């Protein structure tokens, strides 16, 4: 048998998209490998812990609490499925997200090639590399180096999933010159509906798909109407696990999640800044905020509420403020618009700073540079390349979804791939205009670039915003018992914003952990002066009073804490102990019974109940 000669491997035979995927995945895996050797792989607090804890509850068989979802459920159930197959290991979902993020880079390359393809009679800078592919490659490289994408692709957050699906749908629209089949439209609707159970802003792409049906693709009116109906039906079908659970298991008319009401209030209230500044009565952190929002609504209404009623309560507060202050609302929208494009990074969970400080992710691009280049590129492309308007519309629709609530670094991340395409186009066109001596066009672009740079660089004057990263970094150091780093970070946060209740509370926790009880009390009282509803400060002051055997004072602090957090089982337990030591056995029995009713998993609750039952009135 005659053997064929071996063919040497040539790199140029490997598609660019494959090389891109492998290169970006390697960068993300570098960050993930560093993450596995750090304290940040297993979340202990914040939004990441919220999802991780929810997934673990599902694994234990707590599929539902028979109430409407109060938090979008998809990511928690997805984590639970991964944990069920692979065990409780955050590495696996992070690896999948790294793959998706590499896929986003490939989508950028393909979008660039499709949208910015060299038109007839137009010459590219390189005969061997058409304009569209160069722009797509530049945008993909920008995405690989974009620092927030590096961070959010490897932690337990659903952001990478949204970004990939968002731009996959845009690519499906842009790459087609003819209307897709009804079956394809149905699948796209299902995909958007399913993804909305994780991040609801994907639904702002539905109008883009419907617009493509009527404006981009030709077809009979009846077929267009049928396609629109199928897309909408697909969205409802994709989201059906959420609304079926809410309507038929919880018997509560909620489409996806009832927490949309409190988000609307946080974004539209008298003290709103366009960022998630929590009004009095609500505390930072997803889990704490959700609990506070239910407790505050029920206290205001004087009765237990369904989740839909909680959502309606907060939505009506926001709408009432908007009706009463239309001028302030318009100014707030302008502030949100400015915040969306600002170079200032409001990373509400401070993951980017933490990962960068620990050298887990590489130094890279920030939003400010991308926005400064992307805005003039968007204007030029909108003018010269009609196909790019679909990409621009996707960016603007995503921005519109945030104007209804508030802006954070992770929320605006889905707009970055589109801005990178426009930034790459702008740089490409600037170089081409300079090389071909089209100085007028180059000058116009540079003038727009100067204006966009000035716009995105407008300073943030609120010192509390500058305190966010140092505050969150201080909390992370405190949880890791790195008290010297925690002190340095929290003191800097306090210097930025001494009148912030949460920073005062964190300072109290730091001084308590380091044994300075007097300073801890001072900061807890400072937190209560700034926020009289701060249940955590009341609780910790009660614990200190217990340790000092000042039983009546401890009881008073715990009762105040329960006014604002009535379903906290630990506080009921501590109040029962204070009442027992004060000799109020009847109250002690009532409080420990309530603690056990709320959370029967704690053996110390039953031990205290037994101690109360065996205590005679004259023994105290």
Regions found by a protein language model. Name each.
Residues 43, 70, 74-75, 92-103, ...:
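Multi-pass, polyprenyl lipid-linked donor-dependent membrane glycosyltransferases
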Residues 95-122, 168, 172, 372-376:
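Transmembrane-helix motifs of polytopic, lipid-linked glycan transferases
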Residues 255-336:
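Membrane-proximal stem/loop segments at transmembrane-domain junctions that anchor or position
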Residues 34-52, 65-78, 87-91, 253-258, ...:
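Extracytoplasmic catalytic/substrate-binding loops of multi-pass membrane glycan-assembly enzymes
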Residues 92, 320-391:
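Membrane-interface anchor segments at the N-terminal boundary of transmembrane helices
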Residues 129, 134-137, 172-193, 222-229, ...:
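Short hydrophobic alpha-helices at membrane interfaces in multi-pass membrane enzymes
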Residues 1-33, 113, 223-234:
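Start-transfer (signal-anchor) and selected internal transmembrane alpha helices
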Residues 19-20, 108-145, 163-164, 183, ...:
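Transmembrane-helix signature of polytopic, membrane-embedded enzymes
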């Amino acid at each position: 048998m005659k053997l064929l000669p071996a063919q040497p491997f040539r790199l140029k035979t490997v598609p660019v998209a494959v090389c891109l995927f492998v290169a970006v995945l390697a960068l993300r895996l570098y960050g993930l490998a560093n993450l596995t050797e750090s304290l940040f792989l297993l979340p202990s607090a914040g939004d990441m812990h919220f999802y991780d804890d929810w997934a673990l509850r599902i694994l234990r068989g707590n599929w539902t609490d028979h109430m409407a979802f109060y938090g979008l459920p998809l990511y928690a159930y997805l984590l639970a499925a991964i944990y069920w197959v692979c065990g409780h290991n955050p590495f696996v979902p992070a690896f999948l997200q790294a793959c998706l993020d590499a896929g986003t880079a490939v989508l950028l390359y393909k979008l660039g090639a499709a949208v910015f393809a060299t038109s007839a009679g137009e010459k590219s800078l390189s005969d061997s590399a058409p304009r569209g592919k160069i722009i797509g490659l530049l945008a993909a490289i920008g995405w690989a180096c974009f620092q927030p994408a590096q961070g959010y692709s490897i932690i337990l957050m659903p952001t990478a999933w949204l970004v990939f699906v968002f731009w996959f749908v845009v690519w499906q629209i842009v790459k087609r010159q003819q209307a897709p089949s009804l079956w394809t439209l149905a699948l796209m609707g299902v995909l958007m509906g399913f993804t909305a159970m994780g991040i609801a802003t994907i639904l702002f792409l539905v109008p883009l798909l419907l617009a493509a049906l009527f404006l981009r693709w030709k077809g009979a009116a009846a077929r267009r109407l049928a396609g629109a109906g199928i897309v909408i039906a697909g969205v409802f079908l994709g989201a059906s696990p959420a609304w079926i659970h809410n309507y038929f298991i919880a018997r509560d008319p909620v489409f996806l999640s009832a927490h949309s009401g409190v988000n609307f209030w946080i974004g539209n209230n008298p003290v709103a800044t366009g960022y998630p500044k929590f009004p009095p009565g609500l505390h930072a952190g997803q889990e704490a905020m959700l609990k506070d929002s239910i407790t505050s609504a029920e206290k205001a209404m004087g009765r237990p509420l369904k989740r839909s009623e909680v959502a309606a309560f907060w939505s009506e507060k926001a709408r009432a403020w908007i009706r009463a202050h239309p001028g302030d609302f318009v100014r707030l929208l302008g502030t949100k618009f400015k915040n969306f494009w600002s170079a200032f990074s409001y990373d509400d969970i401070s993951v980017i700073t933490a990962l960068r400080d620990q050298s887990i992710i590489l130094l890279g691009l920030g939003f400010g540079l991308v926005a400064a280049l992307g805005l003039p590129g968007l204007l030029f492309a909108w003018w010269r390349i009609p196909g790019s308007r679909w990409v621009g519309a996707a960016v603007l629709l995503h921005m519109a979804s945030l104007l209804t609530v508030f802006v954070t670094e992770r929320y605006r991340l889905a707009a970055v791939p589109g801005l990178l395409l426009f930034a790459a186009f702008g740089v490409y066109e600037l170089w081409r205009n300079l090389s071909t001596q089209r100085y007028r066009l180059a000058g116009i672009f540079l003038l727009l670039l100067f204006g966009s740079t000035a716009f995105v660089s407008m300073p943030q004057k609120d010192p509390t915003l500058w305190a966010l990263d140092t505050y969150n970094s201080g909390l992370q150091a405190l949880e890791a018992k790195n008290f010297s780093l925690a002190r340095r970070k929290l003191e800097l946060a306090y210097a930025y914003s001494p009148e912030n209740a949460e920073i005062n509370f964190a300072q109290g926790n730091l001084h308590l952990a380091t044994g300075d009880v007097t300073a801890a009390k001072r900061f807890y009282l400072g937190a209560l002066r700034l926020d009289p509803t701060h249940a955590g400060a009341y609780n910790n002051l009660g614990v200190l009073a217990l340790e000092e055997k000042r039983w009546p004072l401890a009881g008073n602090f715990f009762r105040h804490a329960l006014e604002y957090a009535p379903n906290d089982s630990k506080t009921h337990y501590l109040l029962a102990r204070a009442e027992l030591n004060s000799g109020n056995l009847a109250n002690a029995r009532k409080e420990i019974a309530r603690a056990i009713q709320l959370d029967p998993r704690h053996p110390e609750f039953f031990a205290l109940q037994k101690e109360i039952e065996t205590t005679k009135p004259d023994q105290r």
